Each structure stands twice: as structure tokens, then as C-alpha cells.
Amino acid sequence: MRTPIMSCCRLMAVALFLFCSMPLFAQRQDILLNDNWKFRFSHQVQKGSEIRVDLPHTWNTQDALSGKIDYKRGIGNYEKKLFIRPEWQGKRLFLRFEGANSIADVFINRRHIGEHRGGYGAFVFEITGEVNYGKENSILVR
């Protein structure tokens, strides 16, 4: 005899089984990329003009303290090299940003993969088809 309680218990048992087995199917690995970026302004084209920064970073935090009326504006370039392991082939790869003010163009190996507008919202780009596996890849955020 089926009772609503038995049906509910069966449903909960199936849901619990599926919930417990999910990690076997979908394991996600997050790698923090905040350290060791190179920053330069777009107008600084000479080699060696970049500085090493860790994220989060802003280039004009000290401007208000300098006594000048204005503050730096323009386009900044953040660059990083990233080795993509060969065993990651066949897996989906994403770049997730916690925020970038105010327009961010993202490039992988000199190919534009997307643009984000807005200052403080997180955004994600899939880079699976843009990377070279077993090699160092370049990330540029402009």
C-alpha cells in the first residue's frame, strides 16, 4: 500500500542519492589568478614600462592625496601568462572576474573573447576554445 509518507521517503532517498553522487560527475577546480600581473597604461609602449601588481588593483588611488586637482584617466592594460595543463583538454575552462571598472575587454592569446560594461559586478567568459593546451597562454584585460 502506497502512502504519501512512503512516496515522500522514496523521493527524498532518490534526491539524497543524486545529491551525494553529484561530486563524482562534476568536480570543479578554482585557481586564483590574482598574483603577479603586469600593468601599464596603453600609451606606455616602451618595453619595461610595466609594473608588477596583484589584484585587486587601481592605478589612481594616490591621486587625491597628491594635491593635484585632476586624477589619472585612460586605458590600463593588465597582462598575465597562464600555463594551461594538457590534462585539462576536454574540460570547460572559464575566466571569472569579481569586477573591473568600467569597461573591460578581455583577450586570450591576442584574440578578443569578450567585453564587460559595469564597475562592480562579477562576470565570466568561457575560454575553452581559445587556449593552447600544454603551453603558456597570454591573458590581457584592457
Question: Over which residues does each language-model region extend?
Answer:
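Short non-domain terminal segments
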Residues: 15-17, 23, 37, 92-95
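Accessory beta-strand-rich segments of carbohydrate-active enzymes
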Residues: 40-42, 73-142
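Sequence-pattern detector for short linear motifs
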Residues: 5, 13, 62-66, 83, ...
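Bacterial Sec-dependent N-terminal signal peptides
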Residues: 1-28
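Accessory carbohydrate-binding/adhesion or oligomerization-edge regions at the termini
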Residues: 23-69, 83, 113, 138-142
